A protein has these predicted regions:
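Multi-pass alpha-helical transporter architecture, strongest
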Residues: 95-106, 245, 281, 301-326
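Structural signature of the two symmetry-related core transmembrane helices
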Residues: 1, 206-221
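A membrane-interface helix-boundary motif in multi-pass transporters
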Residues: 67-94, 288-307
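Helix-to-loop junctions at the C-terminal end of transmembrane segments
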Residues: 190-204, 290
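Helix-loop junctions at membrane interfaces in 12-TM secondary transporters
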Residues: 1-15, 223-235
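Intracellular juxtamembrane helix-capping segments at the cytosolic ends
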Residues: 25-39, 244-259
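Short amphipathic helix-loop junctions that connect adjacent transmembrane helices
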Residues: 157-180
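Juxtamembrane intracellular "pre-TM" segments in multi-pass secondary transporters
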Residues: 108-146
Length: 326
């Protein structure tokens, strides 16, 4: 039984790693389609709509799986042990596979100049370096990427470790954590729409500045939060700015790409790698500070520092065609 449990754990870990790698790779191509399917004046709206639809899908599937796990008798699964949980994983895979077919059939087709696998291995690293060389020559793109790196360290760490903070510092139970996750997803949908409208009105840079200020306030508030009601309010604020900062970061980056660039995938590959590196930095800083301080409240303040650094760098970015207020 112990060996079987160990084998199942190994399968779970390997499956998680494969899924993470698959998602990380797919999001590069997904993001890179934005300049191909929308004109610059529509980047904010289309990027926000993409995140909004993604959050709608995640909420629907999450609710379905929660019902399967919580009320297995409704689905004829009573007394089947862990089968409802395993079925939930299966539904996620089928959901991804099914909706991927829609994307494959509707998105613009690839060009004919495809590379061999050998060429991909040889040229991939060179393409990455080429993007960085171009970015260094474009001052505003380079500044935005530095800003994005630092505030992404905060954003991705909050997304990944919010439930840990809730269970550790707020002593929240599983059902309460589920409510927090649902709250984040629903309000992220709303936030993506609100901040797309705001960015259209005042400009992407000013919109991001507003969001980073709010993120900083939320992190400082996390240090002082007492009681579950206050935490729910803070989680609601996180949800709003989470959806907004994700969609508007992508739209802003698209606006800063070199004029007439065709290989957007390479640029968004760099963007995604930078985000993953920021996630590693943020998670390490959060865990290290939590270990030193004996709690997670001080660690939340460290995340506020990341947002402030990103905010300061962002103020030096100039975006062509932006409104004067930006």
């Amino acid at each position: 039984e112990g060996v079987e449990a160990g084998q199942m754990l190994a399968i779970g870990v390997v499956g998680f790693l494969i899924a993470t790698a698959g998602f990380g790779g797919s999001i590069v191509f997904y993001n890179s389609y934005l300049p191909d399917i929308a004109t610059e004046e529509n980047y904010n709206r289309v990027s926000a709509k993409g995140f909004m639809m993604g959050y709608v899908g995640s909420v629907i599937l999450l609710i379905i799986n929660l019902l399967i796990i919580t009320y297995p008798a409704w689905f004829g699964l009573e007394g089947t042990g862990t089968l409802p949980v395993r079925l939930s994983f299966l539904t996620v895979g089928l959901w991804w596979f099914g909706f991927a077919q829609y994307a494959f059939s509707r998105l613009p087709k690839d060009s004919d100049n495809r590379l061999s696998w050998k060429a991909i291995r040889q040229e991939g690293y060179e393409e990455f370096n080429n993007v960085w060389r171009q970015a260094k020559q474009l001052v505003n793109l380079k500044r935005f990427l530095f800003s994005f790196f630092f505030y992404s360290a905060g954003v991705q760490t909050v997304i990944s470790l919010a439930s840990l903070f809730a269970s550790s510092e707020m002593q929240m139970e599983t059902d309460e954590l589920i409510l927090v996750i649902l709250l984040l997803q629903v309000l992220a949908l709303v936030g993506a729409w609100i901040f797309a409208k705001l960015s259209d009105r005042i400009g992407n840079k000013a919109g991001l500045v507003v969001m980073l200020v709010l993120w900083t306030v939320v992190c400082v508030g996390g240090y002082f939060v007492q009681g579950k009601i206050q935490f729910y309010v803070m989680a609601a604020a996180v949800g709003l700015v989470m959806g907004g900062v994700q969609s508007q970061s992508r739209a802003t980056y698209s606006k800063l790409l070199p004029p007439g660039v065709k290989d957007t995938t390479s640029f968004f590959s760099f963007y995604d790698v930078l985000e993953k590196a920021a996630t590693a930095l943020g998670s390490f800083s959060f865990a290290f500070t939590g270990q030193l301080s004996g709690g997670l409240r001080m660690a939340v303040l460290v995340l506020a520092v990341f947002f402030l650094i990103g905010l300061v760098i962002l103020t030096r970015v100039k975006i062509a065609h932006e409104r004067a207020v930006a």
